[in-house]
């Protein structure tokens, strides 16, 4: 259990210039988290969006240009400001960070040696998003296969920089969240790391509501 105030985060990809109603529950979790005196961290996936999360996807995501991703990030910030307080005068002001800031500067050899060595390919193949692609014999790129490692590294970086001890996310992110918890425990030898997932808001046919899927209900009025 948490005995002191801490920080927790949720990651959002930048595949669109707005969020949809499927992101409403995660946003409300961060809002309540802040209302109890903790510090919410919004992680923009400026780096990982260049790769694409395979979770809940039947096919490889379309790769966006860096220019489009940067444009989306600016507009997404306005959505977050409707739910969270970024007032720097408050002790637990929300933080907005971008994983491009650390992922873009990684040295491949050092990363494979220091971080990649902590991951088991056997375990990665058991992740539901990976397992389903392979079962259906659908294409899974090397980029997507490594997504869970990068998300785990995000958690590790936030733990180091902001003492972030909790990652929130949708139920489809459980495997990725656990990967981050395991990485931190292996490197920092601590047990005070947590993951919390929430149910997904789905479409009428039971599919995950996503920004790139048909029928998305947007949180920005200019997208409605």
PLM features: residue spans?
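N-terminal catalytic cores of NTP/NDP-binding nucleotidyl/phosphoryl-transfer enzymes
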Residues: 2-54, 167-174
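Structural motif
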Residues: 7-8, 41, 95, 165-166, ...
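Short connector loops/turns at beta-strand edges and beta->alpha or beta->beta junctions
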Residues: 46-49, 152-155, 203
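Short acidic, glycine/serine/threonine-rich loops at helix termini
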Residues: 52-56, 106-112, 207-213
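A charged helix-plus-loop insertion that forms the helical arch/lid used to bind
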Residues: 54-70
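Conserved phosphate-binding loops in nucleotide/dinucleotide-binding enzymes
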Residues: 62-63, 99, 103, 182-187, ...
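Divalent-metal (Mg2+/Mn2+/Ca2+)-assisted nucleotide/phosphate chemistry catalytic cores
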Residues: 65-66, 72, 82-197
């Amino acid at each position: 259990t948490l005995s002191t105030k801490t920080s927790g985060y949720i990651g959002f990809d930048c595949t669109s210039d707005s969020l949809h109603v499927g992101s409403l529950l995660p946003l409300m979790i961060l809002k309540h988290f802040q209302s109890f005196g903790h510090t919410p961290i919004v992680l923009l996936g400026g780096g990982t969006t260049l790769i694409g999360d395979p979770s809940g996807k039947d096919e490889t995501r379309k790769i966006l240009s860096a220019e489009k991703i940067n444009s989306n990030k600016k507009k997404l910030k306005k959505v977050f400001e409707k739910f969270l307080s970024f007032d720097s005068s408050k002790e637990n002001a929300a933080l907005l960070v971008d994983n491009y800031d650390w992922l873009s500067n990684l040295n491949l050899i050092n990363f494979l040696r220091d971080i990649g060595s902590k991951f088991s390919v056997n375990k990665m193949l058991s992740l539901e998003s990976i397992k389903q692609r392979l079962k259906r014999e659908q294409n899974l790129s090397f980029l997507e296969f490594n997504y869970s490692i990068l998300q785990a590294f995000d958690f590790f970086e936030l733990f180091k920089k902001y003492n972030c001890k909790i990652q929130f996310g949708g139920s489809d992110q459980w495997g990725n969240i656990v990967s981050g918890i395991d990485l931190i425990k292996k490197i920092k030898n601590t047990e005070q790391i947590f993951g919390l997932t929430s149910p997904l808001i789905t479409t009428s046919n039971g599919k995950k509501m996503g920004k790139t899927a048909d029928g998305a209900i947007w949180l920005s009025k200019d997208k409605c």
